[in-house]
């Protein structure tokens, strides 16, 4: 079977880069859609151009809203999506692959392409392990970029090998237009020029992106304040943290997926342990929350009571356990409160289990709900107050680090 020539390998590499360019383009488009501070559907398919996903929660949305999707988040609202750098780099690799495929090029050009092709592959390996170890999901657009990078690296490396083999073949057996021998006199200046072109291609889209970003500073403190600062019954939780530098009040629902993502983001970015955390349970469950006419998260009242039963010292551990096992606990909550209580007792012991049914626990949860009502808290979670200032819902995800950099820079690690 005939092996591909150097030019054919370069063409394959260019095609792989073009596919990566498309995947990176859709990922960047989805990210840029969020800049109006609203929630939008995202693309999540291996087929370029497929319609956006209408699912409320999918792997691509998880990746997009993760701390790993962008750089310079403290400098610009939302930061600069890493897919922009991939978009620029893939553009270069498409162009350079065509440059090799359409003309007679020396071995040094192929060797540069092979070595440079390791850059997107290396970045893909890093992001693959982040997805596996931290996000626990694989975004299809991201996987498309990973595979494109792999094929690009392999094809570029094979093209280098083929160019060296062809350069050493006897005259008459070499395809037309291929150099007959290594061009040792080729100047290293070309390599520096190509390297500069790669760097410029990778950075240029990001520079264009940030130059077009609006100024969000005037918007981040326009979402109201606490009407009632203190809770008269001392019902709120005080969560111990390692290096508290700024007071924050959080309203959380332990079975709320958005609360889980929000909490994990703050922990992953090193923010949570730099906050002096006061927490109120705000379960979106009509069983105890009289502000609702139907339960959005059945069973959340029972789990919220478990968090309260843990007291200040155990509340965080129980809350994070609830976030980790949220799907299972949510299913148990839909079935019966008793099944959910049994699960909690099995994990946290009979003392916590007995506390769930005590009138004092129900009264404390009700006091926290009254505290929320007195402060006109929207019936959605999470809610975050920095001091007495409410952080806008739009600024608790992509814009969180930027908002804290503006309002509480001492919180940033």
List where the protein language model places each region.
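N-terminal signal-anchor transmembrane alpha helix
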Residues: 8-35
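Hydrophobic alpha-helical transmembrane segments
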Residues: 80-102, 123
